[in-house]
Structures are given as C-alpha cells and as structure tokens.
Design a protein with these regions (language model features):
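A domain-start/cap signature at the N-terminus of enzymes
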Residues: 25-64, 178-185, 281, 288
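Short beta-strand element of the alpha/beta-hydrolase
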Residues: 64-74
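Short amphipathic alpha-helix adjacent to the substrate-entry channel of hydrolases
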Residues: 78-95
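Alpha/beta-hydrolase active-site loop
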Residues: 103-123, 142
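Alpha/beta-hydrolase fold nucleophile elbow
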Residues: 123-134
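Hydrolase active-site cap/lid region
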Residues: 142-194
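The feature captures the conserved acid-bearing segment of alpha/beta-hydrolase catalytic domains
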Residues: 173-237, 241-244
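C-terminal catalytic histidine-bearing segment of alpha/beta-hydrolase fold enzymes
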Residues: 229, 233-292
Length: 294
C-alpha cells in the first residue's frame, strides 16, 4: 500500500511539474465543404460561413496559444506590405470573412462576432489582432468597441476613424475628399436618416475609445502624411491624442510625403514586432465574444 502511495505521489509531481511541456491541442480547422489552396506559401482553408465566403491560413509552426490576425476588408491589398504573411511566418494564423462594404454596421458586427466565436471554439486564441485597412478602420474599431475584451490589438493602415471625414468629407477641417455614394451607403446601413443625423452619430472610432483603453487593446496606426482621402489629422491623429489621454497604448508610424496609397510599409517589421508583442503570447482562451453564442 505504501509503495502504491509513493508511486501515486510521484506521478502527481511529474504531471504538475511537466504538464506545461505537454503538446497543446491543435485547432480543428477542417470546415464543412472547404477547399484548400496556398496563400503566400501556407495552407489556406476556404469555406462558407453563414453564407459569407471565409478563409483561415495555417502557419507551418503555430505559436503557443494559437494567436491570429484578422483582416476585416481588403485582404489582398498590398498584402506583403501590411504584415500578414510575415505574421503567419512568425506563427500566427490569419483569417478573413467577407461581409462586404458594410462600414462596421450592426448587421456586419453580428456576422463577425459569430465567426469569431467559431474560430475560438475551434481552438484559436480568444483575442486576435484586427487589421483595418482604409475603410477597414471603421470595421476594426467598431468591432473592438463592441467586444473590447475579445481584441488584443488593432493595426490600422490609412484607417478611417471618423466617417464624417470619409466617406462624409464633412469633418471640421473638411480636408478629405469624401465619397458621396459611400456616404449614402454608410447612412443607410447605420439607420441614419440624413446628414444631420450622421454628423451627430457617436459611433465613430474617435468617439468609442474608452472601452478599448480599459480593456488594454493596443493600437498601431500607419499613416501617409499627404493622405487627402483619409487625412490623418481627422482620423488616426485624433485617435492617438485621445487614446493617450485615456492611458491607452498606441504607436504611430508616419510616412512623410505619402498619400493614401500605397498601404503598409516597405518593411513591415515594426508592425509585425508590435503585434507579436501585444497579441502573440499564449493568449486568453476564455469564451467567445458573446458568452454561450455558438
């Protein structure tokens, strides 16, 4: 009996002492009806989720906790300059679901949240790094404001942070060109009856930063200082000033003399390093953005 007790004690000690070295469970990324191809040299799973085209890229060797980056729109724009392939090479998964030109509307956020739930259920980290390119800034920041505890970081690139600037062209400084057709779509999707209602709307990223700061969401924004489509002075620079006042973490990278294009950086290493630092750890594997939503 004493021999059995000693063996049991030693077994408990070994498991307690070395359990962290045991291989972690791998994400289940085999989706119903999926097809597979290569994305920048890595395996990509392509599938349909709630009638929306979606995909997830697997790294060759995943980082502990299975962190991931999530591009909200324009996943094929300036890809090599916007850090995603480099993050996958560093062990991130990378995901996308096509919700169209929906400007972070409530209906789009519902689909994004359900997709997020599904990927967490399948084994990815609960807090991804969001990538918001151009109008994707509205998508990324609005999603993070709705679910701040479910986002680790945001990378915004020439990112729209105030719809009055773009597509409205009606921010205080009126520095941006605006887009009348997109402005009309934006108002319709957000249930805003007219210009007056849209100008008074309080759902812009510049106005919804407090929840992100409280949740510790780290922000990095890359801006072209000569951007006259999404002027930094009406968008990312406002976010930076307000986020710092709230005690949030934000880094700005300026591109002197550069306009709205090209997005990204000749060498995106600073963005990659920032996202690894703030979103590449073991990760929070708590439930998805809406507890119990599946």
């Amino acid at each position: 009996m004493r021999s059995f007790a000693v063996k049991l004690f030693l077994t408990v000690i070994v498991v307690a002492g070395f359990g962290s070295a045991l291989p972690a469970a791998q994400p289940d990324l085999t989706f119903p009806g999926e097809t597979r191809d290569q994305w920048h040299g890595h395996l990509r799973h392509r599938f349909t989720f709630r009638d929306h085209a979606a995909w997830v890229v697997e790294p060759a060797v995943a980082r502990p906790g299975h962190p991931w980056s999530w591009c909200l729109i324009f996943p094929d724009a300036f890809t090599e300059r916007c850090a995603a392939p480099q993050l996958v090479a560093a062990g991130f998964h990378h995901a996308f679901i096509d919700v169209g030109n929906t400007f972070g509307s409530p209906a789009a956020l519902e689909i994004l949240a359900a997709f997020h739930d599904e990927l967490v259920r399948r084994g990815l980290a609960a807090r991804p790094a969001l990538v918001g390119i151009s109008r994707g800034g509205l998508f990324a920041h609005r999603y993070a404001a709705a679910y701040p505890e479910r986002v680790a970081a945001i990378y915004g690139d020439a990112a729209v942070c105030d719809a009055r600037s773009w597509p409205g062209g009606r921010a205080v400084g009126r520095a941006g060109k605006g887009s009348p057709a997109d402005w009309a779509t934006f108002k319709q999707l957000h249930g805003l009856a007219d210009d007056a209602a849209a100008l008074e709307w309080t759902g812009n990223p510049v106005d919804t930063l407090a929840p992100l700061a409280r949740a510790g969401v780290a922000l990095i924004h890359v801006v072209g200082d000569a951007d006259d489509v999404v002027p930094p002075a009406e968008n990312a620079l406002v976010v930076a000033e307000r986020y710092r006042q709230l005690g949030g973490t934000i880094e700005l990278i300026h591109k002197p003399g550069v306009g709205h294009h090209p997005h990204g950086l000749d060498d995106p290493a600073p963005v990659v390093a920032f996202l690894i630092r703030h979103a590449g750890g073991a990760g929070d594997r708590s439930p998805g953005p809406r507890d119990g939503a599946r």
